[in-house]
């Protein structure tokens, strides 16, 4: 039954990719809340997007479809960065004046190793696929399949506690290495937010819906809470080594809605930046 469901989603995904220059009809896409199944290999899909990009709405829909297709194994971060993510204060106001960029996303976008030269573009575990670190949406699914076939090297767990009085979240992330690794390993913990509504270009000239005025942005990167590429948690870790890190993040100065936010944590090779495992949990537990 699960295979039948995946085939149906793949057919839908293929249609979305083939129609990537056309408008996305309402409701644009639906989103299921998924959290990590820590008994399986997990994959990070980064969707580099922008509200001035006419192809980014279909790409966002494709990213969400892939997260549903590989429920509990694929986790999406929507990174608003690059020239198509800038506010437009001339041509499209007031629909596209919002600025969804953040320092973390800007630095990732500018990393020459990632070679993100356009929107939409994505990375799957920041590992090469067909000789490229970043690639267009039509390649995401096959890159995910390849990434999921890699051996699992770690088990991760995350426990979040939200204090409603002072609007802070405390998180503890435990990483158990299942095999010995060479080199340094970093842990990066990011805040992402769902259900932000705003304008999104969605067409070529003459399309009946050139701007989706209430597009639902999901998985939006708000920033990292422990540095652009995280911090070191292990150096040449042996099998069964456990690394534990705890953080507190303050929402009180932010306009973000904690109930719409999740923390997403991933470990990576400190040198190559390849993501080795990822986990996600809501800021406020249901």
Where are these predicted regions, by residue range?
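Bacterial Sec-dependent N-terminal signal peptides
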Residues: 1-5, 13-44, 286
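Secretory pathway export signals and precursors
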Residues: 17, 49-52, 98
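The N-terminal extracellular segments of secreted preproproteins, especially immediately downstream
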Residues: 20, 52-55, 187-189
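Disulfide-rich extracellular modules and peptides
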Residues: 23, 55-58, 124
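Intrinsically disordered, low-complexity boundary segments flanking structured domains
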Residues: 30-32, 62-67, 141-147
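Local sequence-structure signature of Cys/Sec-based thiol-disulfide redox active-site neighborhoods
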Residues: 34-84
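Short, conserved sequence motifs used for protein processing/export or organelle targeting and
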Residues: 78-286
């Amino acid at each position: 039954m699960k295979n039948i469901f995946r085939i149906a989603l793949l057919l839908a995904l293929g249609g979305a990719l083939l129609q990537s220059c056309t408008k996305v009809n309402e409701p644009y896409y639906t989103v299921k809340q998924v959290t990590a199944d820590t008994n399986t290999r997990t994959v990070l899909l980064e969707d580099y997007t922008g509200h001035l990009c006419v192809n980014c709405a279909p790409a966002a829909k494709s990213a969400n479809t892939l997260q549903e297709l590989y429920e509990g194994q694929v986790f999406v971060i929507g990174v608003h960065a690059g020239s198509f993510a800038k506010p437009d204060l001339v041509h499209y106001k007031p629909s596209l004046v919002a600025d969804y960029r953040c320092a973390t996303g800007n630095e990732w976008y500018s990393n020459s190793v990632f070679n993100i030269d356009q929107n939409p573009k994505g990375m799957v575990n920041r590992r090469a696929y067909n000789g490229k670190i970043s690639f267009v949406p039509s390649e995401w699914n096959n890159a995910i399949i390849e990434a999921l076939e890699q051996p699992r090297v770690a088990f991760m767990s995350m426990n979040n506690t939200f204090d409603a009085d002072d609007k802070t979240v405390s998180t503890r992330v435990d990483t158990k290495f299942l095999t010995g690794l060479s080199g340094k390993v970093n842990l990066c913990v990011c805040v992402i937010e769902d259900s932000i509504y705003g304008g999104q270009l969605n067409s070529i000239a003459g399309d009946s819906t050139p701007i989706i005025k209430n597009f639902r942005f999901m998985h939006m990167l708000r920033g990292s809470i422990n540095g652009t590429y995280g911090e070191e948690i292990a150096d040449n870790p042996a099998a069964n080594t456990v690394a534990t890190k705890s953080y507190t993040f303050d929402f009180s100065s932010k306009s973000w809605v904690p109930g719409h936010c999740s923390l997403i944590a991933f470990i990576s090779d400190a040198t190559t930046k390849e993501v080795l495992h990822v986990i996600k949990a809501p800021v406020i537990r249901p």
